[in-house]
Amino acid sequence: MAAIFRASLVAFATLASCTDASKLLGFENKRHIIPNSYIVALKEGLPERDFETHMAWVSDVHSANVALAGGASTSGVKHTFKINGWKGYSGSFDENTLHELITNENVDYIEPDRMSHIASLDRKFALETQRNAPSWGLGRVSHRQGNSRDYVYDSTAGEGVTVYSIDTGIDIKHPDFEGRASWGINTVDDIDEDGHGHGTHTSSTIVGKTYGVAKKAKIIAAKVYDARGRGPDSATLKAIEWAVDHAQKNNHTGKAAMNLSLVTDSPRAVNAVCTKAVEAGIFLAVAAGNDNRAVTNESPASADKVCTVGATRLGDQKAGFSNYGRLVALYAPGQSITAAFPNGRTGTISGTSMAAPHVCGVGATIMALEGVTPQKLCDRLKQLAHPSVRNPGPNTTNKLLYNGSGQ
């Protein structure tokens, strides 16, 4: 594997010296690159007929180069993407094919496909009150002051809103979901279950009966990470494409949310499709990341129009691990959060992965209650939030998520 990886870097250096290197993005960052695997973005507005012609050309070029090499060392196109006007594809290509892709007039840019990972550290209201809620985050987001464990929320509780969980899958049989969780797509393996636990935990925080914020919303699993909490960025792109298509076909746009408690190293493509998803009518809550640094190129935290969430701990301090900076929209509880785990269990874990679901859940509640559009929802949440976060970090908001309960 090391030899293959070094060879791919040599190929990149050779290509960059003799082609339009401006189309090659992110190759200088060697972290988590999958050898000979690429994400290819096509130029904005490419007509469907030209897209189909291009894909046939790619197939022909790959087949010809495999024949010249005396056999298949790469597999060609794996996924195609059409996401609210953004078109592209991913696959495994040799150096000769990559050279032809770079020089093709329809190609906008090419990024290496990478293994990305979850963003956790461990394994006039009709109000209702959940007394002594089992997760401190629920009490915190429903009170201006931080001294209550009761969760106070509007009785609509996200009813009529569909949430897409881009994660490790969901244990849909867990009693916390009351039958409101279902499977949508699996783009990483052939095991339709949550072998890690992260996706069940985040989904429980969003919609769970006991541990959740929006207790009447529905949630759909789009599995992009395996039992190790890892998967290629192309799997994430394919899942987002599926979610946008599903929302559009089922009239969920305008009343849909998506949670991305993950961090990738392919910012251009992932950011582009996340922005397209918001424009299509889906609210996106995303984790800021856990490196205790300013959000810059982390994706999807740096994408336009998403709602990027930092994490706090008890006492309204920024969690020591949480990223910060001007791209953070607001903070939410993210340290030592208790929620459902697979096989009927519960788990307590930390990360901005745990903060984003609180925002996704409150977002679903506000969408159902006020009819705020997904494109304007993050601004509404910032308007409701209160300035409680201590030491939020340089050039960072001190706004803490609040559901507007009046408490």
Swiss-Prot record:
Leader sequence residues: 1-21
Entry-linked PROSITE patterns: SUBTILASE, SUBTILASE_SER
Keyword GTP-binding on entry: no
Domain Peptidase S8: 135-407
GO MF assignments: serine-type endopeptidase activity
Keywords from the UniProt entry: Glycoprotein, Hydrolase, Protease, Secreted, Serine protease, Signal, Virulence, Zymogen
Propeptide segments, given as residue ranges: 22-119
Residues listed as glycosylation sites in the UniProt record: N251, N259, N395, N403
Record has Protease as a keyword: yes
E.C. numbers: 3.4.21.-
SUPFAM superfamilies, sorted: Protease propeptides/inhibitors (SSF54897), Subtilisin-like (SSF52743)
Domain of life: Eukaryota
InterPro entries registered for this protein in UniProt: PCSK9_ProteinaseK-like (IPR034193), Peptidase_S8/S53_dom (IPR000209), Peptidase_S8/S53_dom_sf (IPR036852), Peptidase_S8_Ser-AS (IPR023828), Peptidase_S8_subtilisin-like (IPR050131), Peptidase_S8_subtilisin-rel (IPR015500), S8pro/Inhibitor_I9 (IPR010259), S8pro/Inhibitor_I9_sf (IPR037045)
CDD domains: Peptidases_S8_PCSK9_ProteinaseK_like (cd04077)
Chief place of localization: secreted
Region (Disordered): 388-407
Pfam families noted in UniProt: Inhibitor_I9, Peptidase_S8
Gene Ontology cellular component annotations, sorted alphabetically: extracellular region
GO biological process per UniProt: proteolysis
Active site: D167 (charge relay system), H198 (charge relay system), S353 (charge relay system)
Subcellular location: Secreted
Domain Inhibitor I9: 37-118
Function text: Secreted subtilisin-like serine protease with keratinolytic activity that contributes to pathogenicity.
PANTHER family per the UniProt record, alphabetical: CEREVISIN-RELATED, PEPTIDASE S8
Family, as annotated: Belongs to the peptidase S8 family.
Protein name, per record: Subtilisin-like protease CPC735_024010
